[in-house]
């Protein structure tokens, strides 16, 4: 089956002179760090083996009580603070995740409750590591169709609870965390083209079912299996290098731009070799690609919004800059979007005003399995806190 892509540009929705732009951003990662040296004590591996093959040196691990919803809620609260708005100013909450707290209720609904929102529609979206690009496109469509003015777009994962910690080919790759943005509708002034138009310029999405079981998590209703990540690494690598370059190129072209006109690329943080391959394939310099996977590993749908939040804090984006995000994931799926940055990076300081203790996610009576780290990691966390 040949792979088909869909995409869109500003002005293709029901309100032709409306686009969207990012006005708030934030992220949350657990305090507990699992280094490659720590992993040497869990599985047969080494820091040298992991670093040279992936670029990952450490990853963050959720402790007891930290969940996809709790991290997503904190990231979202910071994004709201940066945007200078309240939870009830938001019309839509979309959470991209493959590790929800529960099958039902959705993580988005739990986050809505934690934020104190009373009016937003809320739902989860599953497109694996491409999830944030998909969620962005959905929120963009919602807003440009005139269904609302603002959306929270969140990517959040606790992959440490979906990893087989005896499988050294996968357990070294993944980490936990969450990132969020506030996306707002923006009217386009007459006569603006891609060279000057603010906000979202294009997006590109694809799905290829030929790789459905090259990267997957069993354990669905009626499956009867443990929900642990399984991956054909070689097959996934080939797909990732091919599709990320193709999707990024398509999104940039759809925006009416060339790679030379893009100021920053923020890729899904899966593997440094994949990122370097994409850099060469689209003839784009590595120094203009934001990389933080050495600190966090692969956080799936959370990787792009975490990287975006850190890129702004690092001074890598200023008003007028064009950036492109690109991702691939299980399914297979892939996605990219191109945006011209317009927000004041100094607004990021507002995130510090959020009191984590004020953001509480409701839990079921007696707790839930989603609240607990795997036993092998709990022992590690216990030693760290002695």
Locations of regions flagged by a protein language model:
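Acidic-glycine-rich active-site phosphate/pyrophosphate-binding loop
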Residues: 43-52, 102-116, 153-159, 217-222, ...
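Anion-binding (especially nucleotide phosphate/pyrophosphate-binding) glycine-rich loop
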Residues: 82, 86-118
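Short glycine-rich phosphate-binding loop at a beta-alpha junction
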Residues: 88-96, 259-268
């Amino acid at each position: 089956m040949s792979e088909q892509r869909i995409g869109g540009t500003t002005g293709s929705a029901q309100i032709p002179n409306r686009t969207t732009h990012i006005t708030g951003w934030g992220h949350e990662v657990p305090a507990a760090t699992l280094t490659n040296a720590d992993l040497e004590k869990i599985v047969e591996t080494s820091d040298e083996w992991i670093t040279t093959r992936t670029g990952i040196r450490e990853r963050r691990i959720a402790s007891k009580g930290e969940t996809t919803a709790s991290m997503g809620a904190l990231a979202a609260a910071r994004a709201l603070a940066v945007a200078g708005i309240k939870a009830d100013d938001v019309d839509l909450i979309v959470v991209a995740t493959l590790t929800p707290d529960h099958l039902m209720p959705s993580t988005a609904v739990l986050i809505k409750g934690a934020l104190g929102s009373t009016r937003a529609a809320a739902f989860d979206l599953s497109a694996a590591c491409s999830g944030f690009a998909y969620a962005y496109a959905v929120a963009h469509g919602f807003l440009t169709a005139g269904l609302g003015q603002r959306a929270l777009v969140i990517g959040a994962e606790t992959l440490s609870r979906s990893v087989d910690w005896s499988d050294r080919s996968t357990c070294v790759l993944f980490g936990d965390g969450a990132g969020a943005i506030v996306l707002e509708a923006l009217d386009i002034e007459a006569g603006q083209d891609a060279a000057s138009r603010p906000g979202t310029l294009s997006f590109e999405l694809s799905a290829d079912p030929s790789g459905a079981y090259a990267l997957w998590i069993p354990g669905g209703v009626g499956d009867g299996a443990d929900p642990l990540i399984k991956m054909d690494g070689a097959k996934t690598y080939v797909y990732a290098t091919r599709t990320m370059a193709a999707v990024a190129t398509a999104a940039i072209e759809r925006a009416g731009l060339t790679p030379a006109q893009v100021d920053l690329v923020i890729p899904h943080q899966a593997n440094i070799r994949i990122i370097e391959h994409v850099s060469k394939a689209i003839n784009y310099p590595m120094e203009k690609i934001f990389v933080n996977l050495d600190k966090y590993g692969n956080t799936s749908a959370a990787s792009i919004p975490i990287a975006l939040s850190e890129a702004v804090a690092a001074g890598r984006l200023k008003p007028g800059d064009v950036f492109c995000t690109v991702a691939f994931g299980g399914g297979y799926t892939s996605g990219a979007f191109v945006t011209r940055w317009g927000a004041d990076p100094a607004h990021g300081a507002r995130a510090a005003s959020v009191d984590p203790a004020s953001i509480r996610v409701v839990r079921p009576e007696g707790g839930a399995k989603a609240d607990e780290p795997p036993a092998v990691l709990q022992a590690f966390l216990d030693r760290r806190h002695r």
